[in-house]
Amino acid sequence: MKRLVLLGLSGWLLVGCHASSPSSSFVQVRITDVTVGLVKTDGRPWDDVGVVSARDIADLSSALGAPDAAIAVTNFLARPALEGIDKPDVLGSATLFLGAAPPAKREFKGQPNSQKPSLDPAPVWRNVPLDDSTRIEVTLFDEDLVNDDALGTFVIQAADLAAAAESGVVHQLQVAKQTGNSVLFVGLLVVPEP
């Protein structure tokens, strides 16, 4: 009898937890900005203009490992010594994948010559479920007169969206490892649907 009560209670707790979990909620997702690294994945500066020192690369790596890496990287990129380094002209696309639903692609551009461009138009999706099938794939390029340079592709998982929703503000998700440090962060604003 005690086992039945415990099993019944544990089953009720599991159902109750599942019903209130973020995986059953719907949100609006907005990608606000990206933070781009100092160099392309091959180590050359954007548009092959300027010189990026080994010290700059090491300092950026240290900033990426800081407790609040997004702030440390933003402060690092604002250093006057980096003003002479060419910055990319970001353009790209973001595609939302939801299980078997058709992909929902959004294209955008960033401000020219910026290490941390806001995206225009900002990719937005409404009524996005926070479940394991949800992911967003982002592909970025440095727009050039001839032959755009690949900045990188990264994936935003459902768990990343849930963390952004929990933060309640623009959440800077570190994506540097996915892109070989060519793209460092992506800004996500995830809010509950009314």
Predicted regions and their residues:
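C2-type phospholipid-binding modules
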Residues: 34-37, 143-194
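C2/C2-like lipid-binding beta-sandwich modules
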Residues: 20-91
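Peripheral membrane lipid-binding modules
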Residues: 78-163
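C-terminal motif of bacterial Sec signal peptides marking the signal peptidase cleavage site
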Residues: 15-16
